[in-house]
Amino acid sequence: MFGHLFVRDSEIILIDPPLVPGLVESITRMGKPKAIILTAQNHIRGSKYIREKTGATVYVPDQDQRAVEPQDAQAVKEVDQFEKYSTGTGNLLGFEVFKDFYDFALLTDHKELIIADNAKGSADGELLLYPESVPHDPVHPANETIRREFKELVKKTGAVTLLAGHGYNIYGNLQDLADRL
């Protein structure tokens, strides 16, 4: 599992931050965390702790509740203070918000697509979509709807890089890999 950190005008924005020892101290050496954005409600990870230590605002996606496990919904409630966002939110702290199946995707101004769980790179540079991205024997391929929707998302956003929540990132050739789906 990964998180991402963006520094914008000396303000720090965390995307799906993990809960690891020393993270808050390391981040605050660079600046004051302004926000924590979750791409899926099950990515709550270190959000509550980081918010309590830094005062950063937590943004939680307004997900379809059929895609949210009860324990994840409870963990979000325990964050206590958060803002909900959706595709109608518009620009969220410099990120464009898009729907990605039941989760949300964020697009940076450098055409980097930040995805929760539905896509990732493999060690050999291939693009994997859920559920093929989860180790199974035999491999469970992604269905055609998932492939088509992801391909359309990449094309619509113009994204060239995938910043994945799990697995490997894909740098520079996301359009080409999505075209091959």
Per-region residue spans from a language model:
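Metallo-beta-lactamase
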Residues: 12-14, 91, 96-180
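Short glycine/proline-enriched coil/turn segments at helix->beta-strand junctions
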Residues: 9-10, 30-33, 52-56, 108-112, ...
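Zn-dependent metallo-beta-lactamase
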Residues: 1-10, 54, 156, 175-176
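Active-site HxH/HxHxD metal-binding segment of metal-dependent hydrolases
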Residues: 19-87
